[in-house]
């Protein structure tokens, strides 16, 4: 890592296999979300660090856990609908990033997948989501983009 890279930050996340993407899209459709996250953008964040770390992404396809429940994350006046994941794998990879010196902007890490970035005043849907298997195809990293908008 070069000294000039330190202020770039590190973003690390996972992408899902087709069966997992199909399941998330089916949830979006059943809930009739107004502006769902597109299939190619569905992911789960591992690390959102304002400092660059030497994170090494894993590239193997594997099951990493299961869906747990729906929740709304309120942030910057928006109400994002997420599926919380029961994933010791994601928790351990987040801890790996912390050991490498990653920063984190929130008090706790909650593995999740965002289904819609803003559901407005919509109530949390009552659909059961517990226990669906979640399989990733790979992890990836990129420089942190502090200007990113959904």
Swiss-Prot record:
Chain positions recorded as 3',3'-cUAMP binding sites: 11, 73, 142, 148
GO biological process terms held by the UniProt record: symbiont-mediated suppression of host innate immune response
SUPFAM superfamilies: LigT-like
Residue positions of the active site: 43, 45, 112, 114
Binding site for 3',3'-cGAMP: 11, 73, 142, 148
Keywords: Host-virus interaction, Hydrolase, Inhibition of host innate immune response by virus, Viral immunoevasion
Residues annotated as signal peptide: none
Gene Ontology terms for molecular function: hydrolase activity
InterPro entries named among the record's database cross-references: Acb1-like_C, Cyclic_Pdiesterase
Domain of life: Viruses
Catalyses which reaction(s): 3',3'-cUAMP + H2O = U[3'-5']pAp[3'] + H(+); 3',3',3'-c-tri-AMP + H2O = A[3'-5']pA[3'-5']pAp[3'] + H(+); 3',3',3'-cAAG + H2O = G[3'-5']pA[3'-5']pAp[3'] + H(+); 3',3',3'-cAAG + H2O = A[3'-5']pG[3'-5']pAp[3'] + H(+)
Pfam family, one: Acb1
Function: Counteracts the host CBASS antiviral defense system. Phosphodiesterase that enables metal-independent hydrolysis of the host cyclic di- and trinucleotide CBASS signals such as 3'3'-cGAMP, 3'3'cUA, and 3'3'3'-cAAA. Does not cleave cGG or cA4. Besides evasion of the CBASS system, might also enable evasion of the type III CRISPR systems that use cA3 signals.
Family: Belongs to the anti-CBASS protein Acb1 family.
Name of the featured protein: Anti-CBASS protein Acb1
Lineage of origin: Viruses, Duplodnaviria, Heunggongvirae, Uroviricota, Caudoviricetes
């Amino acid at each position: 890592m070069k000294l000039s890279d330190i202020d770039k930050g590190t973003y690390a996340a996972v992408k899902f296999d087709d069966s997992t993407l199909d399941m998330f899209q089916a949830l979006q459709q059943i809930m009739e979300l107004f502006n769902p996250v597109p299939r190619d953008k569905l992911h789960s964040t591992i690390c959102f660090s304002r400092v660059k770390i030497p994170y090494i992404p894993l590239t193997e396809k594997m099951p990493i856990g299961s869906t747990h429940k729906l929740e709304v994350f309120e942030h910057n006046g928006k109400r994002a609908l997420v599926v919380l994941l029961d994933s010791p794998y994601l928790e351990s990879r987040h801890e790996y990033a912390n050991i490498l010196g990653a920063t984190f902007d929130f008090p706790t890490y909650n593995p999740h997948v965002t289904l819609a970035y803003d559901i407005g005043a919509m109530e949390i849907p009552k659909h059961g989501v517990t226990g669906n298997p979640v399989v990733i195809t790979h992890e990836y990293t990129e420089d942190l983009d502090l200007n990113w908008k959904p």
